[in-house]
Amino acid sequence: MEIALVPLENGGAMTVRGGDEARAGCGQATGGELQCPPTAGLSDGPKEPAPKGRGAQRDADSGVRPLPPLPDPGVRPLPPLPEELPRPRRPPPEDEEEEGDPGLGTVEDQALGTASLHHQRVHINISGLRFETQLGTLAQFPNTLLGDPAKRLRYFDPLRNEYFFDRNRPSFDGILYYYQSGGRLRRPVNVSLDVFADEIRFYQLGDEAMERFREDEGFIKEEEKPLPRNEFQRQVWLIFEYPESSGSARAIAIVSVLVILISIITFCLETLPEFRDERELLRHPPAPHQPPAPAPGANGSGVMAPPSGPTVAPLLPRTLADPFFIVETTCVIWFTFELLVRFFACPSKAGFSRNIMNIIDVVAIFPYFITLGTELAEQQPGGGGGGQNGQQAMSLAILRVIRLVRVFRIFKLSRHSKGLQILGKTLQASMRELGLLIFFLFIGVILFSSAVYFAEADNQGTHFSSIPDAFWWAVVTMTTVGYGDMRPITVGGKIVGSLCAIAGVLTIALPVPVIVSNFNYFYHRETDHEEPAVLKEEQGTQSQGPGLDRGVQRKVSGSRGSFCKAGGTLENADSARRGSCPLEKCNVKAKSNVDLRRSLYALCLDTSRETDL
């Protein structure tokens, strides 16, 4: 049964029971209303409502009963104790984890809070220029300086509620666009290459961003060549393959260049008439049936020539005693030794065999052994040493062609000559333009040789007997050489010749600027590699000896290991800014006429240097 105190309008109170009977404390109900006089001890003033219980009036007709009399006014009644509302059941710990952060409420509230946190604005001050972005934009790359809260915390200014960076202001447009675009890096037009590369490294955008930046700016990634794993083979390979690796490597390179030059000079000198006549006399002495005039003597039989057999034996020592043959043998011995040593020490035998320079080395020494075998075969009895059959003449013709291959030894100098390497790279990069040039010349030769042939056909003294015979004239005219051995005579032929010369000038002039541009690019890139090496030697930061740095020995770049040497330039540049080294030694630009791309290339190559925060 529930009991509740219900205040009345006249100041009384009644108790409502859940049953059918109710007694009024101050009166009884009349006409459905309860009438009670004022309770004793209460003023007619504002009445304070009695505290309510948990019950409610069930029925208007239910009975009431009077409350017990109130205590005296002098005694203060005790207020009724409020009943405790039932507390909600506290969820177990696993339920709390599922519900999320109690400060945010439900899981949905936590998601909304996280989303609002990502959309929170961040103020970045770059040398006084304020930028504003969102935390979610920076959080796309958490490994960068701005994306990692722990890394950027040291730059936070609590007074201004912003991050302050004393860096280049125009460069930050490209840095912020990197975050906004999701990884696209674009250099502002008013920022130099080296400055923007330094900003990329400061904000720690990573090696991948640096590689993309280098590719966008037109830098070609050099192929890294591994070194042999064996320590002895590594040292031998560095000595014979990379002349700048040590002093002994430079000495080997000097000896190799001298041997190549001696071989080329010998190849040219042995074709002089005086040396050629002497060699012919050594190889082919007078025949037995053509002796010199006999001198009178006591014994007439002394003028008889010996039989042909004994005359073959002296030819062998005479041929091997030829000075040119001795010099050639010495050079070939060195070339063979160098080739075998490099093949033994190379890290990859298959890659060594496919290298064009190694193929040239083999071709350079191959004719010697064929010539030596042929000479020895001719000296054998019954080998046709007299040279009186057609087979020997054919073999001599083949030997001349084979010995012509010796001229390719001059390309061995490209291993030690940067100029030849630049020329080779330029031709390799300009193959398309060279193909177009040859194609244009081919079309012009066909057109103008046909035109000049028909223009000169009616003239009896013409120099053009056929269209193929006019090819030579068209090539000489289009290349503006003009030997004059073949020339048009008639007016029509001269007009054709004039048009041919003009067309040749225009045809050659079109692709030449592209080839020159490629040459300039490779030339400046090679000089960029030389500058850090010179500066490194002046500073003396690293000794040039067999004990090379382990990091350099693991991977060597394709062009003199400049990738490994670029770090020295950056260290010297940092020292120059800090004032720890003389300015005349640290400032590369002040010592040589080097453009802006030199310092950038060194910065881009050294992607492993950590940025000081």
Curated annotation (Swiss-Prot):
Gene3D superfamilies: 1.10.287.70, Potassium Channel Kv1.1, Chain A, Voltage-gated potassium channels. Chain C. Keywords: Atrial fibrillation, Cell membrane, Ion channel, Ion transport, Isopeptide bond, Lipoprotein, Membrane, Palmitate, Phosphoprotein, Potassium, Potassium channel, Potassium transport, Repeat, Transmembrane, Transmembrane helix, Transport, Ubl conjugation, Voltage-gated channel. Residues 66-83, 285-295 have a biased composition (Pro residues). The chain crosses the membrane at residues 248-269, 324-345, 357-377, 396-416, 432-453, 495-523. Residues 1-108, 282-304, 532-559 are annotated as: Disordered. There is a cross-link at residues 221, 536 (Glycyl lysine isopeptide (Lys-Gly) (interchain with G-Cter in SUMO)). A lipid is attached at residue 346 (S-palmitoyl cysteine). Residues 1-211 are annotated as: Tetramerization domain. Residues 418-431 are annotated as: S4-S5 linker. Residues 61-82 are annotated as: 2 X 11 AA tandem repeat of D-[SP]-G-V-R-P-L-P-P-L-P. SUPFAM superfamilies: POZ domain (SSF54695), Voltage-gated potassium channels (SSF81324). The amino terminus may be important in determining the rate of inactivation of the channel while the C-terminal PDZ-binding motif may play a role in modulation of channel activity and/or targeting of the channel to specific subcellular compartments. The transmembrane segment S4 functions as a voltage-sensor and is characterized by a series of positively charged amino acids at every third position. Channel opening and closing is effected by a conformation change that affects the position and orientation of the voltage-sensor paddle formed by S3 and S4 within the membrane. A transmembrane electric field that is positive inside would push the positively charged S4 segment outwards, thereby opening the pore, while a field that is negative inside would pull the S4 segment inwards and close the pore. Homotetramer and heterotetramer of potassium channel proteins. Interacts with DLG1, which enhances channel currents. Forms a ternary complex with DLG1 and CAV3. Interacts with KCNAB1. Interacts with UBE2I. Interacts with XIRP2; the interaction is required for normal action potential configuration in the heart. Belongs to the potassium channel family. A (Shaker) (TC 1.A.1.2) subfamily. Kv1.5/KCNA5 sub-subfamily. This is Potassium voltage-gated channel subfamily A member 5. The gene is KCNA5.
